[in-house]
């Protein structure tokens, strides 16, 4: 069965501290270009009247209001670092508006880390009070179905840690990667759209660079690519000029 048509909304594409960065007076952080205002990285996938969120950033409340998200049907976590998980408590308004617990998908180590951060959300007694109501579902690396759309976990390296990116239909979302193993590259063939980590131009121990991610796009032959987890080293206008001069897909 073919994947249902879906819409991807980019809720944030900034690095862990966001852009502008607190206390910074560089050209990007003081830019008046709204495209240089980047919240923490997350996307929303909408289809068949459903909304599936990848990661709950500390900016999630702002992101939900900006994108007019009124209902949330499932959440998928890439990993448990603060810039990807600390917005979980902002689920409460969705519980007020819709019945039932919201399914939350994550690898076992990611779920355990989130549980340690938010023990009251996982406590059955606390569920009787005004806390987010979720249904934890553990990922084992196998494909899983969400409302007719298949999601495939893609193992990627975030420094010394293995985390998940996800392929869904003809698209894939990979953030916070310093390396994509060959076995995972094989799972990313025949894509139309990909989101890749591109923190900055200079090398970083736990994140990809612009040039490295461009090479990944070329190797995969993806029709269209978007970069995310971008820091204040990259102003949008300058990056777009550089992109137009060297690569058509990105």
Predicted regions and their residues:
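Cap/insert and terminal regions of metallo-dependent hydrolase folds
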Residues: 179-247
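Hydrophobic pocket-lining residues within nucleotide cofactor-binding pockets
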Residues: 139, 156, 198, 230, ...
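Binuclear metal-dependent hydrolase catalytic cores
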Residues: 1-174, 183, 238-247
């Amino acid at each position: 069965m073919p994947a249902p048509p879906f819409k991807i909304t980019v809720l944030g594409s900034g690095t862990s501290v966001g852009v502008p960065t607190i206390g910074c007076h560089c050209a990007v952080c003081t830019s008046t270009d709204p495209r240089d205002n980047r919240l923490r990285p997350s996307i929303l996938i909408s289809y068949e009247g459903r909304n599936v969120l990848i990661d709950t950033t500390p900016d999630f409340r702002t992101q939900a209001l900006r994108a007019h998200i009124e209902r949330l049907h499932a959440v998928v976590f890439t990993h448990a670092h603060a810039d990807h998980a600390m917005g979980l408590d902002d689920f409460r308004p969705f519980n007020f508006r819709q019945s039932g617990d919201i399914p939350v998908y994550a690898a076992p180590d990611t779920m355990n880390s989130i549980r340690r951060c938010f023990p009251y959300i996982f406590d059955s007694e606390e569920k009787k009070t005004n806390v987010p109501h979720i249904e934890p579902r553990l990922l084992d690396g196998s494909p899983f179905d969400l409302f007719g759309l298949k999601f495939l976990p893609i193992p990627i390296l975030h420094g010394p840690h293995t985390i998940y990116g996800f392929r869904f239909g003809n698209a894939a979302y990979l953030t916070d990667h310093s390396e994509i193993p060959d076995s995972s590259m094989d799972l990313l063939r025949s894509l139309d759209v990909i989101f890749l980590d591109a923190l900055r131009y200079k090398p970083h121990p736990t994140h990809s660079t612009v040039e490295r991610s461009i090479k990944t796009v070329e190797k995969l032959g993806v029709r269209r690519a978007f970069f995310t987890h971008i820091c204040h080293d990259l102003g949008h206008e300058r990056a777009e000029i550089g992109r137009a001069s060297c690569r058509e897909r990105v």
